[in-house]
C-alpha cells in the first residue's frame, strides 16, 4: 500500500548505526483553497524555515535519528509533523574477558570466579531501534517551537520505552530529555550505545532555559527532577527527595563545529536514618568542561572533564554502582558523598566524504573518604575505556560500522579485570 511504502522509506535499516542528514533543496509554495488542510510532502518541498527547525541537532547526540524524509505540513508551510526513525542492529563478540551488558561498561566486567567462567561472549541487539514524532513550527508569539517524542525498545522484556518527550519554545525546554549537565555535540561517535565511561550522560524531567541572543555565546539554566542512587543498609534508606537539582552552563562557539562549554550542577540528596530516626540531606556538586573543534578540515577533536561529589548518577560508568551517597563508616547512621571524576579525549578523521574513523580514551574514578569502602575492598575504584572504529556511509539512508573496545576495571584492592569487544 502507499502508506506502507512511505513507512518503509522513512525507516533506516542499519548495521551498527543510523541515518544521515538530508537537507532542504528549495522552498516550494503550495497553493490550496482550504486554509486548514494539511498535505503529505517530501522534505525538500517544505518551507525553508520548517526545514531549518526540523534539521536542528544542537540538542541531539550521534545515536539520535535525523529529520524524517517526509512531513505532514499545513498549506502555508508554517507547521510540520515528521514521523520517522531507524532500525539499528548490532552484533557483538567479547573475548579475553566479558562485560555483563549489551553496552560496554567497564564497571560491569565481572569478578573472576563469580559464577561465570566464560571468557568469550556473543550477543546481538536491536533494542536501540528508534521511533519518533517531531512537530515543528513558527508562530508570532512563540517563535520557533518543537514538540518531540521518541522511544526505543530498551524497556523490560524489550518493550517500547520512552526516551524523550518535551516541548521547546522561546528558549525554554519543558519535559523529559537529556540533562543539562551534558554536552551532546562533544560526544565522540561510537557503535557502543553507552559511549565513553567517563562522559556525563543521563535523562531527566526538567524545566530549562537556553539563551543564545549573544553572538557565539549560549547561556543555560535548569531545574531538574532529582534521582538519587545510593548504597544503603538496615540503618539507612533513600526515599523522598525534597529539592530539585539545579544546573547552569555557558558555551562559546567559534564556528558551526567548534565550541567550548563549562557547566555546573548542585543537588541536595535526602536520606533517612533509623539510628537517629531523622531525615538528613547531603549536598553534591559537579563541574564540567567540554569541547569539540576542528584541528584541520578532516580532523575533529572531542573532549570532556567532569569532577564533583555525589554525581555518580550522571557519569556513565558510575551510574551502575549506586554511589551518589554511601554509608559513612566513621559516623554510624549517617551517609556521605564521595569525590569522583570522569573524562575522555578523542579524534575523528574523515578519510573521504563517505568514510571516517575515530578513536577515544576515557577514564572514570571513584575516590575514598572516611574509610569507605571498609567492608568491601573489591568495590570499584577506577574504570578505563578505549574505543577505535570506522564508519562507511553507504548511501544517504544506510551507514555501517566496525568497532573495537577494550575496558579495564580496577577495585580498591588494586585487583584489575579487563574485557575486549568487537562491534559491527
Which sequence ranges carry the predicted segments?
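Residues that define the transmembrane beta-barrel architecture of outer-membrane proteins
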Residues: 79, 120-129, 159-163, 168, ...
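Transmembrane beta-strand segments that form the barrel wall of outer-membrane beta-barrel proteins
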Residues: 143-155, 219-226, 263-268, 356-365, ...
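N-terminal periplasmic/intermembrane-space "pro-region" immediately following the signal or transit peptide
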Residues: 23-95
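Detector for outer-membrane/organellar transmembrane beta-barrel domains
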Residues: 253-380
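Outer-membrane beta-barrel translocator domains and adjoining extracellular loop/strand segments
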Residues: 97-100, 157-163, 185-192, 230-238, ...
Amino acid at each position: 500500500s502507499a502508506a506502507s511504502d512511505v513507512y518503509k522509506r522513512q525507516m533506516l535499516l542499519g548495521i551498527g548505526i543510523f541515518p544521515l542528514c538530508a537537507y532542504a533543496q528549495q522552498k516550494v509554495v503550495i497553493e490550496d483553497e482550504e486554509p486548514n488542510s494539511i498535505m503529505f510532502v517530501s522534505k525538500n518541498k517544505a518551507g525553508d524555515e520548517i526545514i531549518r527547525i526540523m534539521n536542528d541537532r544542537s540538542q541531539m547526540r550521534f545515536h539520535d535519528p535525523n529529520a524524517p524524509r517526509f512531513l505532514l505540513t499545513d498549506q502555508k508551510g508554517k507547521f510540520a509533523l515528521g514521523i520517522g526513525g531507524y532500525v539499528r542492529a548490532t552484533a557483538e563478540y567479547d573475548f579475553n574477558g566479558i562485560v555483563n551488558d549489551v553496552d560496554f561498561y567497564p564497571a560491569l566486567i565481572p569478578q573472576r570466579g563469580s559464577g561465570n567462567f566464560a571468557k568469550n561472549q556473543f550477543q546481538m541487539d536491536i533494542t536501540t531501534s528508534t521511533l519518533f514524532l517531531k512537530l515543528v513550527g513558527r508562530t508570532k508569539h512563540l517563535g520557533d517551537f518543537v514538540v518531540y517524542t521518541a522511544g526505543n525498545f530498551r524497556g523490560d522484556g524489550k518493550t517500547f520505552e520512552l526516551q524523550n518527550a518535551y516541548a521547546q519554545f522561546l528558549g525554554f525546554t519543558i519535559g523529559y530529555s537529556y540533562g543539562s549537565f551534558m554536552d551532546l555535540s562533544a560526544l565522540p561517535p561510537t557503535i557502543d550505545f553507552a559511549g565513553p565511561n567517563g562522559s556525563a550522560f543521563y535523562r531527566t524531567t526538567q524545566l530549562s532555559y537556553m539563551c543564545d541572543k549573544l553572538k557565539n555565546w549560549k547561556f543555560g539554566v535548569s531545574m531538574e527532577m532529582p534521582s538519587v542512587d545510593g548504597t544503603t543498609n538496615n540503618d539507612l534508606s533513600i526515599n523522598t527527595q525534597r529539592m530539585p537539582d539545579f544546573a547552569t552552563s555557558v558555551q562559546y562557539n567559534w564556528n558551526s563545529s567548534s565550541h567550548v562549554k563549562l557547566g555546573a550542577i548542585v543537588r541536595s540528596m535526602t536520606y533517612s536514618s533509623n539510628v537517629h530516626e531523622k531525615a538528613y540531606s547531603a549536598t553534591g556538586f559537579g563541574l564540567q568542561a567540554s569541547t569539540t573543534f576542528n584541528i584541520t578540515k578532516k580532523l575533529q577533536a572531542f573532549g570532556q572533564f567532569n569532577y564533583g561529589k555525589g554525581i555518580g548518577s550522571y557519569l556513565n560508568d558510575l551510574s551502575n554502582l549506586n554511589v551518589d551517597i554511601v554509608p559513612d563508616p566513621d559516623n554510624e547512621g549517617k551517609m556521605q558523598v564521595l569525590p569522583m571524576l570522569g573524562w575522555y579525549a578523542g579524534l575523528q578523521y574523515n578519510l573521504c566524504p563517505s568514510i571516517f574513523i575515530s578513536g577515544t580514551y576515557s577514564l572514570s574514578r571513584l575516590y575514598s573518604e572516611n574509610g569507605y569502602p571498609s567492608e568491601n575492598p573489591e568495590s570499584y575504584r577506577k574504570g578505563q575505556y578505549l574505543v577505535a572504529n570506522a564508519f562507511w556511509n553507504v548511501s544517504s539512508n544506510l551507514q555501517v560500522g566496525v568497532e573495537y573496545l577494550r575496558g579495564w576495571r580496577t577495585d580498591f584492592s588494586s585487583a584489575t579485570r579487563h574485557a575486549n569487544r568487537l562491534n559491527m
